[in-house]
Every structure is written in C-alpha cells, then in structure tokens.
Amino acid sequence: MIGLNHYLIVSGLLFCIGLAGMLKRKNILLLFFSTEIMLNAINIGFVAISKYTHNLDGQMFALFIIAIAASEVAIGLGLVILWFKKYKSLDIDSLNAMKG
C-alpha cells in the first residue's frame, strides 16, 4: 500500500527538480516550466496530506494553486511571446536590455 510518506517523497523530489531547473536554466520558457513543476509538487503534497487527515483544506489549496498556475501561464506566455518578438531571444541575460 502506498502511504503518505511515498507521496511526500515524490512531492519533495519533484519540488527539488523544479528548483534545480529554476537555478540552472537561463531560458525564460524553461523557468516557467520549472515553476509549474514546483507548483504541481506542492499540489501533490497538499492533496496527500488532505487525504490522510480527512480534511478538505489541502484540496481547496490545491484548487487555488491550479487557478493561480493557469493565470500565470496565460499572462507569462503572452509576455514571453512579446519578449521574443521584440528581442529574438528568450535568454534571461537579455533582460538587462530593458529600459524603464
């Protein structure tokens, strides 16, 4: 039987993979993907704890995180597309070219 520890280990590993992606990558699109992996890892942890404590709070938090992640993707990808059209690069180092 799969216990709470197994879910939390998978959640922790996914979060570490997402964090490593955030720290290592210089591509804006890959940073978005890494953020999504981290948010999904948090969702797995919330839902697993919610199931084993018979409390729905974790599942409600997971739904809020899914909604926030969807809005992040919609707005973020729109900005990435505009950035690529203007600068022809998705490299983080090109962010220094911003003037404002």
Swiss-Prot record:
GO terms for molecular function: NADH:ubiquinone reductase (non-electrogenic) activity; quinone binding. Pfam families: Oxidored_q2 (PF00420). The chain crosses the membrane at residues 1-21, 28-48, 64-84. It is found in: Cell inner membrane. Its main location: membrane. It is an enzyme of class 7 (translocase). Keywords: Cell inner membrane, Cell membrane, Membrane, NAD, Quinone, Translocase, Transmembrane, Transmembrane helix, Transport, Ubiquinone. Its EC number is 7.1.1.-. The keyword Amino-acid biosynthesis does not apply. It is a multi-pass membrane protein. GO terms for biological process: ATP synthesis coupled electron transport. Coiled coil: none annotated. It comes from the Bacteria. One of its GO terms (cellular component) is plasma membrane. InterPro entries: NADH_UbQ_OxRdtase_chain4L/K, NUOK/Mnh_C1-like. It catalyses: a quinone + NADH + 5 H(+)(in) = a quinol + NAD(+) + 4 H(+)(out). NCBIfam families: PRK05715.1-2, PRK05715.1-3, PRK05715.1-5. NDH-1 shuttles electrons from NADH, via FMN and iron-sulfur (Fe-S) centers, to quinones in the respiratory chain. The immediate electron acceptor for the enzyme in this species is believed to be ubiquinone. Couples the redox reaction to proton translocation (for every two electrons transferred, four hydrogen ions are translocated across the cytoplasmic membrane), and thus conserves the redox energy in a proton gradient. NDH-1 is composed of 14 different subunits. Subunits NuoA, H, J, K, L, M, N constitute the membrane sector of the complex. Belongs to the complex I subunit 4L family. This is NADH-quinone oxidoreductase subunit K. It comes from Helicobacter pylori (strain P12). The lineage of its organism: Bacteria, Pseudomonadati, Campylobacterota, Epsilonproteobacteria, Campylobacterales.
